[in-house]
Curated annotation (Swiss-Prot):
Record-level GO cellular component terms: cytoplasm; growth cone; nucleus; perinuclear region of cytoplasm
Subcellular localization: Cytoplasm; Cytoplasm, Perinuclear region; Cell projection, Growth cone
UniProtKB keywords: Acetylation, Cell projection, Cytoplasm, Developmental protein, Differentiation, Neurogenesis, Phosphoprotein, Tumor suppressor, Wnt signaling pathway
Phosphothreonine carried by residues: T20, T330, T334, T348, T357
Lineage: Eukaryota, Metazoa, Chordata, Craniata, Vertebrata
Protein name (Swiss-Prot/TrEMBL): Protein NDRG2
Tissue expression notes: Broadly expressed, with highest levels in heart, liver, skeletal muscle and aorta.
Residues modified to Phosphoserine: S326, S328, S332, S335, S338, S344, S350, S352, S353, S355, S370
Induction of synthesis: Up-regulated by aldosterone in kidney and colon, but not in heart. Down-regulated in cortex by antidepressant treatments.
Segments of this protein annotated with the region Disordered: 1-22, 334-371
Family: Belongs to the NDRG family.
Native source species: Rattus norvegicus (Rat)
The keyword Phosphoprotein appears for this protein: yes
Amino acid sequence: MAELQEVQITEEKPLLPGQTPEAAKEAELAARILLDQGQTHSVETPYGSVTFTVYGTPKPKRPAIFTYHDVGLNYKSCFQPLFQFGDMQEIIQNFVRVHVDAPGMEEGAPVFPLGYQYPSQDQLADMIPCILQYLNFSTIIGVGVGAGAYILSRYALNHPDTVEGLVLINIDPNAKGWMDWAAHKLTGLTSSIPEMILGHLFSQEELSGNSELIQKYRSLITHAPNLENIELYWNSYNNRRDLNFERGGEMTLKCPVMLVVGDQAPHEDAVVECNSKLDPTQTSFLKMADSGGQPQLTQPGKLTEAFKYFVQGMGYMASSCMTRLSRSRTASLTSAASIDGSRSRSRTLSQSSESGTLPSGPPGHTMEVSC
């Protein structure tokens, strides 16, 4: 019998090469995002079924981050680039997240039958208490884009005690006027539903540039298997009522609010007008340069930074959590008392595209930011 010999095999390339601490951290982050697929639920409401996905576990005495997407999108296509951004992990590890898909917008949703009465924007807002009751959540920090921002605002007006803060991107609080309707009808004669929705989501400059992002979202919407459902959500949004915000009146948002819009975005004027109607001691206004119509897609880093300071101002993240940002950013802040000598202050923060931060502390001021 041949004698057994011990043979030593050396790997040509190590399976686990040495990693720097930074690379190891990035790998850990990627693995955590990959493994955390969320749990999807559906709940029946008086206006039909609604689907939502929950990430993380509830944290004691902390609100849930609660998102609502815009027309033509679902929660993934609207929010994934933001919530999967590296620095955002500092925030989401401290909160449970609830991502709502408007009825018929969830992945794999069947097309509604002909003649289906899609919920109004007010009715979509009235579905939210059913979700929170199902999850046994008492308060939220809402993050909404476009139609989702409108829906969360309507909910906050009806249930102010359950909303601790709102981040409203591209909000238009006004109902469509006759001129808007005429323009909408005229556009409908010459443009398809996907093109009209793309014009709602992105600026004309972005659409003309036809970047990879635009090509991706044009394809997603044009070839969506639930395009009929998307059109119903679109019509619901275009039939919205005026929120009737009034500075100093009863119809106003009573929680801290951060308004966000891209410079030259389709909804820039509407967001500026909304800012003029809200309580200046509770409202921050973030106008983002070079971000187009969807800043959560094009500038997730800048929006993450703003969101961190917004949450910190609400008292939910200690300043020690901000050390990484503090090392990598510099701020230029000018504060001035208001002309009428009232207690509210106006703060203007100038940011270049490379550096700048939002001021920390409670959101007791109106803040206009260009970044």
